[in-house]
Amino acid sequence: MMKKILLTILILFLTQAETTAQILPKMWRRAKNQEVLQPKDALRTIDTIIYIARKRKEYGDLLRAELRRRQIILKLSQDSTILAIDSLKKEEREARGKDAVIQAIYSTILATLSVNDTTPYARMALERPELLQRIRVKPKTYRAITNEEFSGKYFNYDLLSIVGLILGNYDLLAERYIQAGNREAMFLIAFEKIRQQLPEKSQEAD
């Protein structure tokens, strides 16, 4: 309880002293420096990023932080992973009917994990594609999430392309960008769909 109070005080101090544009890059650098030798400290830093991102509706940073948190926890222990999945499920349930973007983000994370239930998280994550298509992600955040495999400018740095690519729903993405008249995005999606169907060795040769 005391740790949560101290974390909240720290966050309030940071949010008053600096703008989000200043805080989040600084927190990301701190998390990166901590991750190898101090993974638990890195998790605390990422929890702070998650709090700030949700508060300021920085959806790209929220998705990036939850993905990073998942990767660190998977390396720590099986017990930590189980607890993390339960926490993600709780966040997704609480977002239902309140914030469709938050729900889509947590559904996306859960769809990438073995959650041992029949909830169709991948489908739920893309139930509101038109909404995700309107959400813009900062270019640097877009590159970090996609590992710079795609140039976000062709997708207008929208959240839909990130979620769709993570989940591999190329047909839905193609449909949305055809409707939007975005030929560049349509061709990139078609190319990625073909690339993913190639044998692994062929992909490595690329």
Label for each model-derived stretch:
Residues 5-14:
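Sec-dependent N-terminal signal peptides
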Residues 1-2:
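N-terminal secretory signal peptides that target proteins for export/translocation
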Residues 19-21:
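Boundary at the C-terminal end of the N-terminal hydrophobic targeting segment
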Residues 24-30, 38-206:
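Extracytoplasmic/secretory-pathway proteins
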Residues 15-16, 159:
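Hydrophobic alpha-helical membrane context
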